[in-house]
Each structure stands twice: as C-alpha cells, then as structure tokens.
Amino acid sequence: MRKEPRSIELLSPAKDLICGREAINHGADAVYIGAPKFGARAAAGNTLDDIRQLCDYAHLYSARIYVALNTILKEEELAEAEQMIWQLYEAGADALIVQDMGITQLNLPPIPLHASTQTDNRTLEKVRFLQEAGFTQVVLARELSLNQIREIAERTTVPLEVFVHGALCVSYSGQCYLSAALSGRSANRGECAQYCRLPYSLIDADGKEIVSGKHLLSLKDMNRGEYLEELLDAGVSSLKIEGRLKDVSYVKNVTAWYRKKLDAILA
C-alpha cells in the first residue's frame, strides 16, 4: 500500500561544478559530488571553492548538495577529515555521504550523514543499526529485490535511497578486494582498478578451457526506468543515478529522462 504523501528525490551525480549545475538545470532535486579527498572516486575530487559555488547555485533552485566522503580512513587522516567536514559544512553542503563509522565519533558540525552504499546495506538489521546511529538517509545495496526493499521500508523510518541507473559491480559494494589483491589499489580507498571489466577465460577442474576471452565478471549497467512506480510503492524516498565519472552530456540527458518519467508518475 502506497504511503501518502510522497516526497521523492531524484539524485544525480556530478564529477565537477559544470556537471552539477547541468544536473540541477535538467531536473535533479539533489546532486552528489566528491569531496576534495576521501571519496570513493579518487579521480572525481573537487575543490572547496567549486563545492561552495555549486551549493550556492543549488540553493537558488531549492536543490540539495550531498558531498561524498565515502572511503575507509586511516587513523592519521581523521583530523584532516574532521577539518574538511567543517569546511564543507561552511561551504553549504546539505549532507555528507560516508562509509567509515569512525566519522560519527569526530567533532562534527550539525550536518546530516547519509550511509553510503559502501557500508553494504543489505539487511534490515544493518539499516536499523544505521538509523539508531543517527544516519538520516541510507543507500541500499543495488542487489536487493523489491520485496527486500519493501520489508526494510516497512520496518524502519529512515529515508531509503536506491540506485536506478548506472554501473553494477560483480561484488557487494564495500566488500570487493579484487583490485587491492591484484594491484594494491583499494576500492575502499577510491582507487578501484576495475579488474572485473577485463576479459577472462573460464577453465574447469581438469584444465579444459570452457570460455575464452569473455567479460565474465562485467555486469551490464542497471536501468530501472520501467520500475519506478514499484520502487516508490515499496517505500523508497530517493532515486539515485550512478555516474560521478560521467561527462556532462550523460548527466544531463539521463537526469532529464528520469525527471520526465518521475513527473509522469507523480502527476
């Protein structure tokens, strides 16, 4: 049974200031963007000045800016992270997307915390824990079914965010160690080498090659555009588009497409 009234957020990615502005121009209710450091996309960091400009622009149109600071931190980085969080708060950020629970123990400004998909939010128990820990939004694991999402929504009160479009990983977010094992580049430090996107051959126990040179671990991209109504009925509050490394053409076109579909549902 649908719960009325519905307040649904369309959340778009931005690798930089230009992408963020265009996402807002094409219908995003909120935009998520990388912090200067400690984001899960190391190549998508942004300066504090650019984040401040984007916040100012977003707030003109009643849009929100969420800053991703969603990697595992080393102990010697906590003081720098704390200082950066205060700077992001002063720049106008509306929330932080985080992975490391140690952040909750820092001296923080009054800024909402969202639990990143990197915290591996697959179970009702995990979401309840995050809700009780004070998180104001939880990004659910991409792998959950509609029934699983509905159960979590019915038995918690924290707003739930789900991915509706973009890349899929072969592993649970925050739980993949392939890149770190093969190259020393940790996905939990924003440096995933994406070995799952390479071609592999499949060999059985007898050494016989079953498949040769195929992309066996590379999943097709997600597109839940035809299931938005079902997701909303399941209790989702935020629809998230993946793509903090995508260019501006991708961001504005995918945002506009989902804006049109969502408006038709909510009309």
Task: Provide a role label for each language-model segment.
Residues 2-121, 140, 148-238, 245-267:
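Active-site pocket-lining/capping segments in soluble small-molecule metabolic enzymes
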Residues 132-137, 144:
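Extended, well-folded interaction surfaces typified by the phenylalanyl-tRNA synthetase beta subunit core
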Residues 122-126:
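Short, glycine/polar-rich helix-capping loops at beta-to-alpha or helix-loop-helix junctions
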